[in-house]
UniProtKB/Swiss-Prot annotation:
Function summary: Activator for both CDC42 and RAC1 by directly engaging these Rho GTPases and acting as potent guanine nucleotide exchange factor (GEF). This activation results in actin cytoskeleton rearrangements and stimulates membrane ruffling, promoting bacterial entry into non-phagocytic cells.
Organism: Salmonella enterica I
UniProt gene name: sopE
Classification via InterPro entries: SopE, SopE-like_GEF_dom_sf, SopE_GEF_dom, SopE_N_dom
Stretch list, region GEF catalytic domain: 78-240
Protein name listed in UniProt: Guanine nucleotide exchange factor SopE
Biological process (GO), any one: actin cytoskeleton organization
Length: 240
């Protein structure tokens, strides 16, 4: 019987080939698993996106639903109350009090912005009246500036007149009016309605931010409004 003996070199070659085949098989299996994992990930992601899209469409459909009756019936649904309810929901979505409870700096900035807006509104109204009557507004500006400073508002003094650094329009009114105007543009054609919606926006904003003044040294917006009105009345009563 002939005995076949493999040389060490041939054995090593066969062993290397076997090892390479195993490595390729392992790599192939690993690649297949990776591809399958990626595929499953995209399937899951696509499913989630689809669910979100459907949810968003349902929400949007509910929010913009009108009765499918006559044209006059559809118009009857769109009233001032619908617009005001939308503005109130927009304010709730902004979540001023929620943000303020988590961020003291935001709460402080909100209080300052609200009081500065009250200051600006009263200043402009009274100054316009005094100027129309030919009355010097400098004493009035000095007095309401001092009131703003005493209220704790930051600002600068120039020519003996203190001006709050955040003086300007109420920063929360614009988002409410703009969003409502975009959704219901037909309701904002009339200037009287525009003014009415702005007054409503100011009202619900003041109600929303009122609790932020409960535990601070600043006066509430209503108290500050009264202080400025009393100052303005001193000058207005002397107008001819």
């Amino acid at each position: 019987m002939t005995k076949i003996t493999l040389s060490p070199q041939n054995f090593r070659i066969q062993k290397q080939e076997t090892t390479l085949l195993k490595e390729k098989s392992t790599e192939k299996n690993s690649l297949a698993k990776s591809i399958l994992a990626v595929k499953n990930h995209f399937i899951e992601l696509r499913s989630k996106l689809s669910e979100r899209f459907i949810s968003h469409k349902n929400t949007e459909s509910s929010a913009t639903h009108f009765h499918r009756g006559s044209a006059s019936e559809g118009r009857a649904v769109l009233t001032n109350k619908v617009v005001k309810d939308f503005m109130l929901q927009t304010l709730n979505d902004i979540d001023i009090r929620g943000s303020a409870s988590k961020d003291p700096a935001y709460a402080s900035q909100t209080r300052e912005a609200i009081l500065s807006a009250v200051y600006s509104k009263n200043k402009d109204q009274c100054c316009n009246l005094l100027i129309s009557k030919g009355i010097n507004i400098a004493p009035f500006l000095q007095e309401i500036g001092e009131a703003a400073k005493n209220a704790g508002l930051p600002g600068t003094t120039k020519n003996d007149v203190f001006t709050p650094s955040g003086a300007g329009a109420n920063p929360f009114i614009t988002p409410l009016i703009s969003s409502a105007n975009s959704k219901y543009p037909r309701m904002f054609i009339n200037q009287h309605q525009q003014a009415s919606f702005k007054i409503y926006a100011e009202k619900i904003i003041m109600t929303e931010v009122a609790p932020l003044f409960n535990e601070c040294a600043m006066p509430t917006p209503q108290q500050f409004q009264l202080i400025l009105e009393n100052i303005a009345n001193k000058y207005i009563q002397y107008t001819p």
